[in-house]
Structure formats: C-alpha cells, structure tokens
Amino acid sequence: MPFEFDVITLLPDMFDAVTQHGVTGRAHKSNLYRLHTWNPRNYAMNHYRTVDDSPYGGGPGMVMMAEPLDKAITDAKARQGEDGVSKTRVIYLSPQGKRLDHKKVLQISQLDGVVLLCGRYEGIDERLIEDQVDEEISIGDYVISGGELAAMVLIDAVVRQLPGALGDTRSAGQDSHTDHLLEYPHYTRPEVHKEKPVPRILLSGDHAKIERWRLQQSIGRTWLKRPDLLAEKYPEGLPDREKELLEEFKQLRYRVVANQLMDNTKEQEQ
C-alpha cells in the first residue's frame, strides 16, 4: 500500500514541486506514495472564502480560523481511513515544534500515512491544535512564511526512506545522520580539478581500504562539524577502532594545515 500524505494548505500548487520532480517525483509516479491536498478555503463559512480573522486581545496580523481547518482535517482523516490507513498522525509544521531529525523521519516512515497541517499568517487558533493535532514539528529555529516548505522538507525526507524510492538501496543508509555520522566526501571526474587531485586511495581499487578511508572521513568530519553527534553515538567514548581512525584524521588534517601555512609564508617572502 502506498504511503499517504494529506496536506492541509492554502497553496496546494506548491506541492507540484514534490510530485513532479526528482526522487519524490519518480516515487510518486511509481505509486510509492500518494499526496492529496485540502484547501481550507473550500470549507470557509462565507462566499468570500475567509479562513482568517483578527486575534482576540489585539495584536498584529491575522489568525487562521479553527472551523475550516477542522473540517479539512476531518475529511483528510476520513479519506485515509477509506483507503485502509490505520496508523496515521496529524502533524502541524510549527516553529514551536520538536526539531525534525533522522530518528523522527524514520518513525514517520513506519506509519501508513500522515496529515500535514500548514499554517499561515500569525498562526492557528489554539483550540484547533488542542483538538486535532497529534504532534508539532519544526525544521529549525527560524521563521518562514508558512508551513508548506517545511511540509515539503518532511515529505522529501520520508519518501527517501520508502522501499524502492532510491535507485541504489544503499543510498539512504549512507546519508549523513543515518548512523549519527556525517557523510564522507565524494569525488567524480575529472581526476584533477584546479590542481586538486582525487584522493589516491579512491583510485586504488582496494575496496577494504576505501571503506576504511570513508569511515575515517565520516568520523573526522563529524568531529569537526558536529561533535554533538559523536557524543550521542558514543556516550561512553569512542571505541578503539574509531579512536584510531579519528587520530589518523587529525594527523592528516594538521599536516595539510601545516603545509598550507608553509606555502603562505613562502609566498609572502617572495
């Protein structure tokens, strides 16, 4: 059964970018998932199709009204039920939500479907959140104009985890954050670019050495850029093998930095 995304949004056309392009476009064409949009304006209570109003207590901006959203979510959940979806959640994309990470993406991908609620304006009537929303999710500590872009990020991340979505079944497993490690660097042709050659080991054909180098680079990059991930993966400290690889990475890095300093000094002397 395909994964079911039902999106509550005032801008349904935005999601054509998901269903028509790239990995998510191919997965949609292969019926690995289905995406339905529900426009709250179709549930508005007047002929102006009004879905927002001024906030009680005063203040700037407008607030999305509960009733049109409530009806849209109810219909979305009913449609999922008719299609056999038994495990689903209503997720509100909100800067107040828990930060989306790989663990959460995997949890969502194990469901049969989700209803994604995209807010606009100053926010959504709190009573709707209390009655209908199971979980709030944020894609970062910043504010964007609406929940649509955040919903598309979540959809893309979840679709990548669906069996058959990626051409190479190893791809999702090697992505950064999959194993609490950042991904190793990638290289392709030409062999030399602006006097910078591809690391010699990648041309050796020795797969065991290549895998070791890639693990070394993953550990080293994580140590440099996201040490918090290393602490999370190894709360009691690095195992001996990983510790050895990290020391090798540090030595290589220090050597590169030292050579660069020497080159800069020579240029200044000239």
From Swiss-Prot:
EC numbers: 2.1.1.228
Subcellular location as annotated: Cytoplasm
Pfam families the UniProt entry points to: tRNA_m1G_MT
UniProt cross-references to InterPro entries, sorted A to Z: Alpha/beta_knot_MTases (IPR029028), tRNA_m1G_MeTrfase_C_sf (IPR023148), tRNA_m1G_MeTrfase_TrmD (IPR002649), tRNA_m1G_MTases_N (IPR029026), tRNA_MeTrfase_TRMD/TRM10 (IPR016009)
Gene3D superfamilies for this protein: 3.40.1280.10, tRNA(m1g37)methyltransferase, domain 2 (1.10.1270.20)
Gene Ontology terms, MF aspect: tRNA (guanine(37)-N1)-methyltransferase activity
Record keywords, A-Z: Cytoplasm, Methyltransferase, S-adenosyl-L-methionine, Transferase, tRNA processing
Highest taxon, organism lineage: Bacteria
GO biological process annotation, one example: tRNA N1-guanine methylation
Function field: Specifically methylates guanosine-37 in various tRNAs.
Family: Belongs to the RNA methyltransferase TrmD family.
The protein's name in its UniProt record: tRNA (guanine-N(1)-)-methyltransferase
The organism of origin for this protein: Nitrosomonas europaea (strain ATCC 19718 / CIP 103999 / KCTC 2705 / NBRC 14298)
Organism placement in taxonomy: Bacteria, Pseudomonadati, Pseudomonadota, Betaproteobacteria, Nitrosomonadales
